[in-house]
Every structure is written in structure tokens, then in C-alpha cells.
Design a protein with these regions (language model features):
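Short, flexible/disordered intra-domain loops and linkers
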Residues: 44-45, 78, 138-140, 170-171, ...
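N-terminal pre-core extensions flanking Radical SAM catalytic domains
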Residues: 1-3, 8-10, 30-33, 226-239
Length: 239
């Protein structure tokens, strides 16, 4: 993939630095709407070289760092994980956010313990996309084989939702956000954008979201709304 912007600073709603690192690739790769897994490399040495350069930009200005890698934290190489820990200690990072697919939930406890040992609290985010199990599994192929939101949230702290898809309504989107806020600390709403998959954004559903749903949450400090997948400042093409 072309060079991308991999470091940014989020100044509103839970201010933090964010880095887009590169791993060996999402192990799931079955979500019908997602092509993020294309940002990967099988060469761990090359990944570490790239990731170390990105992590060198972290200043610790907010004491909070979000690490994303177009997959799950466990797909990052060991030297990169060591470097993340070193940067947290060196820059005074007290809160560290990672992403994780449901299939890797069994690895979360060890991750939390590792960083807790150096005084860093971890926050794990899962891409749920919707709490409508039939839509999530039959249409989106997320691979989360349970229906109970509380069970999904048991090992996670934050969730991502995906809106702007055919079949979604104002009521379904509001219900997803409310369910997310009930069971998770934070909710990140992503609006579908055109990518390389056959799944297309539905402009009518997006209009409904913008007019009837988003205004109720745009000022909620626990809800991030990304109209574009680059709104956090990473992922766009580097100049």
C-alpha cells in the first residue's frame, strides 16, 4: 500500500495521541465491508522498523495513546510491543488503547497484566458494528458468535459501530449507540465509505444518520463520530 499518515493527535473528546502501526495482517479477514487488512507485511523486521519510526513521534502530551494496526494487537511483532511499553514508560503514558477482534479475546488478560505491571491501564476496543446479531453475522460476517451485548463487552472497554449500510434505520442506529453506551465506556461510530469491497455506503441511510441520529450524540463526550475513516488523522495518504 502507498505510504500513509501514521501519527496524529486527537484534541477533542478523550484527547490522545494515535498511531497506525503495521502488523502481519488481520487473522480474520472475513468481514465483508473491510479492506484494512491490506495494510500488512509478512516481514516482521520491516514492520518493526516502520513502527519504531512512528512511535518515536509520540510525545506523551496527554498521557494517553491509542494504537491501531488494521487488525488486533496480537498481530504486532514482539519488538514492536516492547517498544510500545518502552515509549509508555519514557513518555509517561498512563492509558493505552488497543483494538482486538473477538477471536483473540483470550489474549486480553495477559496484555492487561503486562502493561499493568508498568503502571499503564489498557483499554480494549472491539469492532461490533451492530448489536443486531443476524445483520452482523449474516451480512457483515464479523465472527462474533454471541448475541448478549454484556457477554461481548465482558472483556472489552470500547466498541466500534458501523453505520450507513442498506437496511439500517434511525431506530436501529440509535439502539446500537444506546446499547453500546450501556455496556461499554466509549462508542466509536464509523460511517461507511467506499473502499475496495463490494459493500457500498447507502447515501439515504447516511442522510438519516446525519439528520436524525448524529445530532443527539455529536456533543456526547463518550461518542466519537467518524464521517470519514481518516477523521482521527491517520490512514490518509502521506504527502
Amino acid at each position: 500500500m502507498q505510504d500513509m499518515i501514521r501519527y496524529s493527535v486527537i484534541t477533542e473528546k478523550n484527547p490522545r495521541e494515535i498511531v497506525l502501526l503495521r502488523g502481519t495482517g488481520c487473522a480474520w479477514k472475513r468481514c465483508t465491508f473491510c479492506d484494512y487488512h491490506l495494510d500488512c507485511c509478512p516481514d516482521e523486521a520491516q514492520n518493526f522498523a516502520l513502527n519504531r519510526a512512528v512511535l518515536e513521534r509520540v510525545t506523551g502530551q496527554y498521557g494517553r495513546l491509542e494504537v491501531i494496526n488494521s487488525g488486533s494487537f496480537c498481530e504486532l511483532d514482539a519488538p514492536t510491543m516492547d517498544e510500545i511499553a518502552r515509549v509508555c514508560q519514557q513518555k509517561g503514558i498512563a492509558h493505552l488503547h488497543f483494538e482486538c477482534h473477538w477471536m483473540h479475546r483470550g489474549k486480553i488478560a495477559e496484555l492487561r497484566a503486562r502493561f499493568a505491571a508498568i503502571g499503564v491501564q489498557t483499554h480494549l476496543k472491539i469492532g461490533v458494528e451492530t448489536f443486531d446479531r443476524a445483520y452482523r453475522e449474516d451480512v457483515l460476517h464479523k465472527g462474533i458468535g454471541v448475541s448478549d451485548p454484556a457477554e461481548i463487552a465482558a472483556q472489552f472497554d470500547e466498541c466500534c459501530l458501523l453505520f450507513g449500510l442498506s437496511g439500517q434505520t434511525a431506530d436501529s442506529m440509535r439502539q446500537d449507540i444506546q446499547t453500546g453506551l450501556t455496556h461499554f465506556d466509549r462508542v466509536c461510530v464509523n460511517v461507511m465509505v467506499k473502499n475496495t469491497t463490494p459493500v457500498l455506503p447507502d447515501p439515504d441511510v447516511i442522510a438519516v444518520f446525519c439528520q436524525q441520529v448524529a445530532p443527539h450524540y455529536v456533543n456526547d463526550p463518550r461518542v466519537d463520530i467518524l464521517m470519514e475513516n481518516t477523521d482521527f488523522g491517520v490512514g490518509g495518504a502521506a504527502q
